Amino acid sequence: VNGTRGSEVKIGNLQADGFGVFGNYSKETTTVYGNSLFDNQQVTYDNDKSKWTYSPLKFWPSDGHIDFLAYAPYDKSTKLTDGSKINNFAVSKVITDQKDLLWTNTTSSISADLTSTKENVNFHFYHALSRLGYTVKLSGNYLSKDVTFTLKKITLAGSPTDATKGAFYTSGTIDLSKQNKIGDLWSNQAGQQEFDWFSGEYIVKNSTKSHPDKVDNGNRDKSEDYLFVIPQNFSDTDGKGDKLYVIVEYDVTYNSGTKTTIHNKVYKQIKKNFEQGTAYMLNLTIGLPIEFDVDITSGVEGWGTDEEINIGSNDNNPWDGIESKK
């Protein structure tokens, strides 16, 4: 299944690239998916006619029904297995080559009124993957003449100490016959891979959420910088499940006085069940200031009670020497 590069499939993309249809004709009362009538038929949008078209045309049977499956964007090499499944959907390691994936299904038959000339199969597509995005900001607003924060790297991996350890599935099987939000859309998930989400130099200026674009040394513009991944549960409630960490590297450069740069690496385990058709935004905050605090009511330790030292008294601590002059 091919897809748009690093960006989601919206209606405009659907019109431009088209979608694929599988259709199985049956006289049985039960739903039977397959490709006896439509076998990965490409459907495209004709802007001049303002309608969806395909060729060669097929025609409604007078009885029975047709069970339809559809997906987008269209790929001429897509084939069905087990009646309704697409095997080995692969998630590219190259973010700009990743593929958003839509699917839908429906059962249709001609109406009882055979004089009708408008029998449309209405499709409503759903997103089959999880979408991840990110923003970055500072913990506060700091004077640039004093300090500069430079984002260097963002990695998603399966370990906080080994950024090469995989986390996300690399492939899986999608069943186009499944309904939306049931949770059984995917099977045979396999592989683990990490993502180098950002590598470069992006100056984070303030506490407003932002995203590096190409003009300011970003790898990709925000609209192209989504991850599309097979749904996966990283909740790790028992400590034995799949693990996901976001690892962020950034420089703090002190500009006043002797210019000094300190490299920082921070990480956080993301305990989340990434679900199909859901978009997630990782909002990253960097630059934890060193602040000082003294309690104005008790921040200075008192002297306590004076320790008495009695000298020259009658308690066995007489003067060491006595000198008298007349």
Where are these regions (language model features)?
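Sec-type signal peptide cleavage vicinity
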Residues: 1-326
